[in-house]
């Protein structure tokens, strides 16, 4: 049976699995769905068309599913969708999507989101990411799998953050951050590649060598972006094992907005 504290207010139309726990003084709206094993701490507000998967842990004072901070929003039925096994720490704020995009803010699985993280409307977060305290995403930001955002990182709207990338403390990200790249600064500048993270995730020395070569092509040879892409594409010839990594980088660079560009 669902465990709901006597002081919590859960709308009768909300759909909570029988194993969900809701802490004191939390408010759950009518269009909320919560999967098995999820724990909702005290003083949380979950509203809007919000779907939360299995085995998530939501800490006190989090606000999930509020309307977007967008003056154009006029009450359209947009959504927040959160996957499984996420940790959402104190005072996090995740807004629903907006009709100006796909109408969905989405969080994947196995993410670690520390206190005061903000996900604005239409953000898309992959799997196994880490957001340190007070990381702030403006609208329409996309974050790839395994990315790590340092504390107080702020991200401009529409920016894309590639898989396995990393930002340092207090980074201001105004341009797209390619996969594997570590950056720092206000505004951000590329510093290196996330080699230690790749080793911890089981990347072979051969794959890491190709990542180093991609870094050299992008940042050490003064090449145009087009020439760097051609150089990166050639790396597969000597390392078929690295094909997924090279393809991911090339696709990211191809999809980068000319107006936004990449971190240099």
Swiss-Prot record:
Pfam families: Acetyltransf_11, Hexapep. Its EC number is 2.3.1.129. Keywords: Acyltransferase, Cytoplasm, Lipid A biosynthesis, Lipid biosynthesis, Lipid metabolism, Repeat, Transferase. The keyword Lipid biosynthesis applies. GO terms for molecular function: acyl-[acyl-carrier-protein]-UDP-N-acetylglucosamine O-acyltransferase activity. One of its GO terms (cellular component) is membrane. Pathway: Glycolipid biosynthesis; lipid IV(A) biosynthesis; lipid IV(A) from (3R)-3-hydroxytetradecanoyl-[acyl-carrier-protein] and UDP-N-acetyl-alpha-D-glucosamine: step 1/6. It is found in: Cytoplasm. InterPro entries: Acetyltransf_C (IPR029098), Acetyltransf_C_sf (IPR037157), Hexapep (IPR001451), Lipid_A_LpxA (IPR010137), Trimer_LpxA-like_sf (IPR011004). It catalyses: a (3R)-hydroxyacyl-[ACP] + UDP-N-acetyl-alpha-D-glucosamine = a UDP-3-O-[(3R)-3-hydroxyacyl]-N-acetyl-alpha-D-glucosamine + holo-[ACP]. Involved in the biosynthesis of lipid A, a phosphorylated glycolipid that anchors the lipopolysaccharide to the outer membrane of the cell. Belongs to the transferase hexapeptide repeat family. LpxA subfamily. This is Acyl-[acyl-carrier-protein]--UDP-N-acetylglucosamine O-acyltransferase. It comes from Albidiferax ferrireducens (strain ATCC BAA-621 / DSM 15236 / T118). The gene is lpxA.
